[in-house]
Amino acid sequence: GLGDVYKRQVLESAITDTLETNYMPYAMSVIVSRAIPEIDGFKPSHRKLLYTMYKMGLLTGGRTKSANIVGQTMRLNPHGDQAIYETMVRLAKGNESLLHPFVDSKGNFGKVYSRDMAYAASRYTEAKLAPICAELFRDLDCDAVDFVDNYDNSMKEPSLLPTTFPNVLVSANQGIAVGMASQICGFNLGEVCDTTIALLKNPDHDVASTLLAPDFPTGGQIICDPAELRELYRTGRGGVKVRSRWRYDKQANLIEIYEIPYSTSIEAILDKVAELIKAGKISEISDMRDETDLSGLKLAIDLKR
């Protein structure tokens, strides 16, 4: 009967064998194909977008509509237009999420420090490659990197970009894969290049003496002991405390915050302060508002007289 059919189809397998044959290949495909940045500092989605823009002549030419770039990128990246456009937004100058943006943008690309400041649709914005991209593609035609087939074998794309500087350390990047996650802070471009040159000249060079601490696109102050920082980078575990930068306007009796930690947003700060005022933990503040405008970020805190 039917019960006998089911009994015959039950296969016994050791969990260790199943993990090795099923889970590990799946985890590796997510790590390699989607989530974790490669040694050039890019995830596949970033690399495909930038290479498409390079092939469109956007390194030397004028800007084109973002929607045009997104459409062309689909030949390399079989994702929806919104996913590709979000990748472009993060790489854009207007969004301010990178120390050295790769996309020279025109129009509203939102802000990394604002949850509510939405970016405009791709049909309204324009973009081209930023000048720094010349260093990403230098010697691309000189057999510097391997080329592989795209998803439908209709064209070739580079497996890596031949960056002339260690971009993986310059561009902040985070990725969540299966069984693995990476969170890489960005560093000052000049310090990274100086450290790289020093290491090439002397393999025993003390990296921490020239690469002092991470740099964040939104600014702020790092509150960390140098010895702790050294240990953090030796082990790869731990975190860095960052606080806002502010100034006091004596005449108006208010505090102006003009730089905030990279991992937070204006709205999250306003919500948290309001929560602390309601809980009675802060009593010196009479009002707090977002005065961010075209000149940059600004949070105003009115103090009680």
PLM feature spans:
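Charged, surface-exposed alpha-helical interface/stalk elements
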Residues: 207-227, 235-305
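Catalytic phosphate-handling regions of large nucleic-acid enzymes and associated NTPases
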Residues: 4-236, 298-300
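Glycine-rich phosphate-binding loop
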Residues: 1
